[in-house]
Amino acid sequence: MKRLPFIAGMLAFCMLVYTCTVSKFSTPNQAGNPYPSRNFVSNPKYNFLTPEESLQTFNLPKGYRLEIVAAEPMIKEPVAIAWDGNARMYVAEMLTYMQDADATGERKNTSRIMLLEDTDNDGKMDKSSVFIDSLLLPRMIVCVNNELLVNETNTITINSYRDTNGDGKADVKRTVFLRNNYNVNDANMEHQRSGLDWNLDNYLYLTYDPVRFRYANGVLTADTMHSGSGGQWGVTHDNYGRLFYSSAGGENPLVRVQVNPAYGALDLPDQVSNEFQEVWPITATPDVQGGLKRLRPDSTLNHFTASCGQSIYRGNTLPPDLVGDYLVCEPVARIIRRAKVLNVKGKISVQNAYYRQEFIASTDMNFRPVNTYTGPDGNLYIVDMHRGIIQQGNWTKPGTFLRNAIDEKGLAKNIGHGRIYRLVYEGNKQQAQPRLLDEPASKLVTYLNHPNGWWRDNAQKQLVILGDKSVVSALKQIATGTQDNLTGPVTHLARIHALWTLDGLGEMDKPTLFAAFTDEHEQVRKTAVWISEALIRKNDPEIFTRLAPLAQDAGHDVRLQLFLSLYSSNSPSAVNLLATLQNRQATNEMFVATKRAMDKNTDIRTYGARLGNMAVTERNSILSGSATFNSLCVTCHGAGGKGMAIAGSASLPAPPLTGAANRLGGSKENLVKIILHGLTGSIDGKTYPSVMPALGANSDEWVSSIVNYVRYEFGNVSSRRRSGDTTAPFVTPLDVKTIREKAGVRNNPWTLEELAKQ
C-alpha cells in the first residue's frame, strides 16, 4: 500500500518537511561484506516482469534466496496474509486500490480474500479458492480457531467468516465487534486501523486508535488505552511481547517500541539514528511523493518515507543471527531493511545490519513489499503488491511531482499483479506442516517449546481459545521448568508462553507466579511482573511483599516492568515500592522518560474535566477533536503539537502547531477551508516538499471537531476560552456546511496568500 504516508486529519500546516543531508551513494567495501557484487541501475525500466524474471533482479546476502510461494493469476494486489493452525494461507487483496492515478472506483466492494493451500508441502501454493468476495479493501485479518476475522476499509466493524462444508469458501458470517458511534476518517484509506496482532499477553493490537481487543466466547471486547500507537501499516511483536510499530506519515521506521502502548506513548530521540534513517536502493527511484528533496543527486530515495509491514524474525530455519532482528519494508525504495535490535539498560534502539546496504533490494520497479511475516515453516514471507503506483490517490494529484513521474514512466498501467515470496537459506530442508487445528490440547502444550515463534504463538492462541483446563497442570510444570515430557529441555521461551497461557485461561495461581519471580531468566521474571497486575489491581497484600525484592533485580527490563505495573496503583504498599524504585533509578534515562510519559496519562484522563465550564456540545466537539488528534495527528505534529522529529534528525515532518491558529489569524473560515481542500506553498517563508491533502470527504461534524480542538489547544481561542470568554467563536457543523457551500468545488489546495485575500 504505499507509503501509507500522512496522517489524515492534519491541518493546514501538516506538510511533510525533510531537509536531510544529501549523501553520496556508495557500495560497501568493508571487510566481511556478505553481498555478491552488483551494479547500480541509474536508468531503470518500468516494464512488467514475470515472477521468474523478477527473481533475477534481487540483491540478497550470500546463502539466501527467494522462492515464489504464490503469484498472479492466483493472487492479485495482496496486502496481508494470515495462516490458520493448519498452515492454510489467507490473502487479503485490495483489488480496487489505485487502478489508475486518480483512484477511480477505489470504493467499490469488489475486493476479496483468497484461501491458498500447499497440498504437497513443497513450499509453493497449488490450490486456491475465493474465500470471501465483495469486500471493500480488506485491511486486517487474523485466524482464530476455524474462523477468519476480517476488517474492511471505512469501518471498524470486525466480522468472522467460516467455511463449514470444506469447499474453500466462507458460508457463515457473524459480527464479532460492532461500534456505531465511531466516525471513521474515510478521506484517506491509508490512515485507518491496521494490524490485529495477537500478542503474548493475549490482547490483539492495532494501529492508530487507543484500543486493543480481547477475544473470548466468540467475540472481541475492546479495552481502551490512554493514547494511540503512533503506528500506521502493520504491528508486530518479538519473543517477549514487545510491540513494534512504524509510521510512514511521520517518516519514521520505528515508533512506540519502548513500552507497551497500554502504559502510554513513549518515543526516544535516539531510538532511530540519522544513519539508520538513510536508505540504500540499488536503482534510481524517481517516483517519490515530495519531490527532489527526497532524492540524492543519483535519483535514489535518501531516507525512509514509506516504512510499513514490519516484523521480527522468530523462526528456526534461517541463520540464528537473524532471530530477533527487525525487518521493515520500504516500497518506494524497493527494499526491505534488516536491523539489529539493541537493548541497553532497558532502552531499545535499532541499527542497520549492513553498512550502507539493504538486506533485500530489487531493481524491478514494480517490487512493492508491504508486509513481512515469520511463517509456519520458519522462513520469512514477503507480501509484494507488485504494482506501478504505491502511493494513494491523495498524493497523485495532477501537477504534482509524483504524478508527473507516474505519467512519464507509465506506472498506472502496472496493476492486477501480486507476489508472495519466502526467503530461504541454502541447505535447509522443508519443515513438516502444522496440524494445530486437529490436535488435542495435550499435544498443543508441547509446541510451547517449539523453536519457531509461529508455532509457540499459535499453540498458545489455540489453547486460550479452546479453554481446555485439562492441561493446566502441565502448563504449571512448564512455567516452573519442571515438565519433562517435552522435546528437549524447557526453554525460557516455553516458560513465558506457559505463563501467558495460564493467564489467558484464567488459571494463574500464586505459587506458579511467585516461582516465576525467581526464575533464572530476566524475561521470565519480567513476564511474571507483567502478569501480576491483576493482583496489584486487587491490592493483594502478599503481592507487594513478593514484588519488593525485584526492585533490586539485576535486569533493567524487570525493574522497568515493575515500575510500569505499579504506577497506576493507589495502594500504600505500591506507592512505597514505587518511591523506592524511583529513588534508585533517578538518573536512569528510561525511568525518567517513562515516568514523564505516564504522567501525561493523567492529563489525558482529566482533559474532559478541564472543559467542564463549556456547553455540552462544545465540550464534546473538542473531546472528539482531541481523540482524532491524539490518535492520528500526533504522528507528525507530535504530542502537545510540539512537532515530531523525523527519526535521527532535527527536521520535522510538519510544523509545530503551537501558535499556528494565531498565525493564520485564528480565522475559523480559513482553517475549515484548509481541511476541506488542503494547503500548499510556503508557510512562514518555508516551502515544504508535500502538500496538505484535502479532507473534505469527512463529515461537517468531524471537520468542526478538529478545528475546535486546534483552536482551543493551540490558538488564541485557548486563553480566551479558559478565561471564561464565551464570545470566542466556536465552529459548528453548520458553519462548516456554510463554508463548504460557499467555497464550492475546488480541485487545487489553497495557499496562504490566497487565504489572506479572502
Regions found by a protein language model. Name each.
Residues 404, 640-683, 688-700:
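Gly/Gly-Pro-rich "capping" loops immediately C-terminal to redox-active cysteine motifs
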